[in-house]
Amino acid sequence: MKERLDVLLVKRNLAESREKAKAVIMSGIVYVDGQKEDKAGSMFDETANVEVRGTTLKYVSRGGLKLEKAMTHFGVTLAGKICMDVGASTGGFTDCMLQNGAVKVYSVDVGHGQLAWKLRNDERVVCMEKTNIRYVTPEEIPDRIQFVSIDVSFISLTKVLGPVKALMEPDGEVVCLIKPQFEAGREKVGKKGVVREKSVHLEVIEMVASFAGSIGFEALHLEFSPIKGPEGNIEYLLHLRNCTDGSTFTNDVIGASGIVDKAHETLDK
């Protein structure tokens, strides 16, 4: 009888959950009968020799690796800060925040039952499941948020940044994941929801940055995510600073074209 590779990892106690198994597999350290395998859905015989070589993922999901890159490249420090993880899902970003010194994290998601058990039981985490960030008011959050990560799907960041801004303290920071497939017009999205055109990637980056600037977010940095989205989409990390003095910004992202080129060179191999 054959099983999916991610299921095999969980059954053999090589991963705590299917989500974590997928992350470990995608990190390129899983071998089946001596051959490296990086697709969680690949089917193998139950008797196959499955090995995890090297260090397993240090976060509850691969999302943590995205925020880790942003923190490293953007010089973000979270020690002692009150944070929010919008689109928390399993909690990879939340986990990364806590491991980097956050004292409190509001984990917000429209779904429910997804946040990893270890995070649910962490007194520093406020689990806000079944919650749409668009309708959260400052009165519901007793703290002013100092750092926000945003990783949402099936909605444009232009619908989310405004509500997030209302919850933040002056000079607070945001790292948002720009997903071209949810920002571009339908006519620009290819088969299986994948956007491959560099020009479209650049267009959506500039659109999101421009919108953010129009509501008082200053764009500080841009990088590409180290991991593709589930369908193979290249995604981008945009670093913003919250300004509350009425300023607006054009947010011409310097070097965006070069970052898009580098993303394709690195991830489309």
Place the predicted regions along the sequence by residue.
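A basic, amphipathic helix-loop patch mediating RNA/tRNA/ribosome contacts
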Residues: 1-48, 82-83
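Short, glycine-/aromatic-enriched active-site segment of Class I SAM-dependent methyltransferases
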Residues: 180-196
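A short glycine-rich, Lys/Arg-flanked "PGG" loop and its adjoining helix->strand segment in the class I
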Residues: 158-175
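Conserved SAM-binding loop of SAM-dependent methyltransferases across substrates and taxa
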Residues: 90-101
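Flexible, glycine-/basic-rich loop-and-beta segments that form/coincide
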Residues: 234-269
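S-adenosyl-L-methionine
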Residues: 106-159
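Conserved class I S-adenosyl-L-methionine
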Residues: 79-89
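Glycine-rich helix-loop-beta junction characteristic of Rossmann-like nucleotide cofactor-binding loops
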Residues: 14, 72-79, 139-142
